[in-house]
Amino acid sequence: MKVGIIGGGGIVGASAGFALQLGGIVHEIVIVDVNADLADGQALDMMHGAPAIADQVITAGGYEDLADADLICITAGLRRKPDESRLALINRNVVLFKSILESIKTAGHKPDASVLVVSNPVDILTYLAEQELGLPQGRVLGLGTLLDTLRFRSLLALNLKAPATQVSAIILGEHGDSMVPIWSSASIGGLPLEKYPGFTQKLGQDTFTRAKTSGAEMIKKKTGAGFAVGVSIAEVIHAIALDSKRVLPVSTVQRGCYGLRDVALSVPTVVGRSGAEQTLEIELWPKEMQSLKRSGSVLQETLGQVLAAG
């Protein structure tokens, strides 16, 4: 599989590239960035380590080098300015994102390529990418709440002194303020979370709050997330490359799952060779269902504002 990473010079894109290199599953990685020297430096740095990992082709390039890519990962984005409103930042990122999509279309892409959107606001941009690129259904997906889910699991493991790989919990909805933790199916080692030694409602809520605000915490402490988002991106790409049919909370334009339509957000999704292949409706508590639908409404309102702004 050939993977192109747009914005691959930055911390998110470079972390994704390195995670893909360590995975040793994809055959070729192309780093594309507006800063060509930075892209070249990141590609060289990874290539230098290739003899110790896997026989992969790792290069820097332009949009023309993505014309035969099996998957294009978009990580480029703008940071918030001081005193800038959330909507103003969203609109600036939408302008940048549309220019990226236009560059992809101009250079050409495989008719069955998959596109993974990581740039924020990921749900809004995933919707726009599907509308603009004209790819088959399921070929455009966003990272969604996968990173939030991994953060949630890792923090539950930390607070309960449990093995992180045995924590099963998922966050659905918007990658943003209206995200929804699904307590009803959360478990550790097969034991319902509420019955796990040491778990309390307060511990659970505090853990979710920290997971929800981890993005801001990362910005404050180290300018932004890198390693964990890179691992999240690799998890999606590896599921596509291996056709592993993993169920992941990625963002796609909904067509009836949980009664949601014409909005991109995260629900349990089977990810395989064809991208987002199927959405699943796990049973939710009524209050979780209400929160998920509210999250959809929040996103539809924001999308309406973005579309109105042109």
Show the residue positions of the predicted features.
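Hydrophobic Val/Ile/Leu positions in short beta-strands of Rossmann-like dinucleotide-binding domains
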Residues: I5-I6, I31
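Conserved glycine-rich cofactor-binding loop
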Residues: G9
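N-terminal Rossmann-fold NAD(P) dinucleotide-binding loop
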Residues: G13-A14
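Aromatic pocket-lining residues of Rossmann-like dinucleotide-binding sites
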Residues: L20
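Conserved N-terminal Rossmann-fold NAD(P) cofactor-binding segment
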Residues: V32-A69, E84, E301-L307
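Rossmann-like NAD(P)-binding element
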Residues: P51-S114
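Rossmann-like NAD(P)(H) cofactor-binding subdomain of soluble oxidoreductases
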Residues: R86-S154
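C-terminal substrate-binding/catalytic lobe of Rossmann-fold NAD(P)-dependent dehydrogenases
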Residues: L133-R139, D148-G310
